Amino acid sequence: MLEFYGKRFESRLLLGTAQYPSPSILADAVRASLSRIVTVSLRRESGEARAGQDFWALIKALGVAVLPNTAGCHTPREAITTAHMAREVFGTNWIKLEVIGDTDTLQPDPFGLVEAARILCDEGFEVFPYMNDDLIVAERLIEAGCKVLMPWGAPIGSGRGFNNPYALKTMRAHFPDIPLVVDAGIGVPSHAAAAMELGFDAVLINTAVAKAGDPAAMARAFALAVEAGRLAYEADPIEARDMASPSTPLLGKAFL
């Protein structure tokens, strides 16, 4: 069972709530995914108050845990301010911490991320840092107080899967006891299954579901892929070989 900061969940699929064609399609996708955690972005604009109220009513009706994020923040100060606002609005110490360093790739700023994580952890937040796949950055985030890490597979929304599978595999081996969630870049269910087969604890999906032709069907496909990948990992799969190995025994073979 998945566990974050002492809370346990049956599903290992986290779902983002942005970019869906309509609220009803979002709701259908969340239900189809079987996800028990959704990420939400705090809207700092106050213009569409009614739309915001309707959105939160929908999320509450789904009965899922909410993981607010600091999407769009480019400095530690901005991210920290947004985290405080999110705690006030959502009544949770959870925060998915994003400090973006590059506007083209949306690659996280590792220095600003560690700085913000240290401050927020000291203030009692339970931080889920969106990070690259660098082991040293991971070490610094753990030292700062993070008990979950969320390395990217590829740039946000790219659908490329894993740019560096070796780095992700190495991170899993290096931190066997830290919950690891692949966040960003996953495009199709096979990517999610591959992440789970590597031993990752969960995956976070947004664009791949929200922008699909049938979001609910895609959400269901991801749910099945995550379950299959986890079962495969727990089943201890065989090692890849360079040479063939006969699956049919020679015992009893007729020799002519």
Curated annotation (Swiss-Prot):
The reaction(s) this protein catalyses: [ThiS sulfur-carrier protein]-C-terminal-Gly-aminoethanethioate + 2-iminoacetate + 1-deoxy-D-xylulose 5-phosphate = [ThiS sulfur-carrier protein]-C-terminal Gly-Gly + 2-[(2R,5Z)-2-carboxy-4-methylthiazol-5(2H)-ylidene]ethyl phosphate + 2 H2O + H(+)
Keywords: Cytoplasm, Schiff base, Thiamine biosynthesis, Transferase
UniProt EC number: 2.8.1.10
Keyword Acetylation: no
Highest taxon of source: Bacteria
GO CC, one annotated term: cytoplasm
One GO term of the biological process aspect: thiamine diphosphate biosynthetic process
Pfam family, one: ThiG
Subcellular location: Cytoplasm
List of catalytic residues: K96 (schiff-base intermediate with dxp)
UniProt KW Transferase keyword: yes
Positions of 1-deoxy-D-xylulose 5-phosphate binding: G157, A184, G185, N206, T207
Recorded metabolic or biological pathway in which this protein acts: Cofactor biosynthesis; thiamine diphosphate biosynthesis
InterPro entries hit by this protein: Aldolase_TIM, Thiazole_synthase_ThiG, ThiG
Top-rank EC class of the record's enzyme: transferase
Molecular function (Gene Ontology), one example: thiazole synthase activity
Listed HAMAP family: ThiG
Family designation: Belongs to the ThiG family.
Subunit and interaction comment: Homotetramer. Forms heterodimers with either ThiH or ThiS.
Its biological purpose: Catalyzes the rearrangement of 1-deoxy-D-xylulose 5-phosphate (DXP) to produce the thiazole phosphate moiety of thiamine. Sulfur is provided by the thiocarboxylate moiety of the carrier protein ThiS. In vitro, sulfur can be provided by H(2)S.
Protein name stated in the entry: Thiazole synthase
